[in-house]
Amino acid sequence: MGVKIDRVAWQSGGRTVNLILWDLHGEDEFQKMRMSYLRGSAGYILVADLTRKATLDKAIQLHMEAQELLGPVPFVLAINKSDLAADAEIGQEEIASLTALGWPIISTSAKSNTGVQEAFARLAKMILEAP
């Protein structure tokens, strides 16, 4: 199982939010271990690959498990690889249905660094505004 940890100080509304980023990967047999890393989290970002529908299904599953573990903490769904829209397997109707359920969704491209900062800014703002 791979875990990459980074720290980022984020400014939002004149306040500093110190984000500790846990990039959790791994196969399904490590799922329970990965979820244990979430304990105490104030929020999270889920990432789905626009060109692989299965990653959206997995993100939805992870969200349900995270909400069960953490309660209703802030989250953002980043739909990555927006630069590969021609190869999309995730349709606009699927994104619209999640948006209608209140999911904050941001289109991103790690390759072109589009939307990535916006995703972190949105999460930081949501954490600061959480009750």
Predicted feature locations:
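TRAFAC-class small GTPase G-domain
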Residues: M1-P131
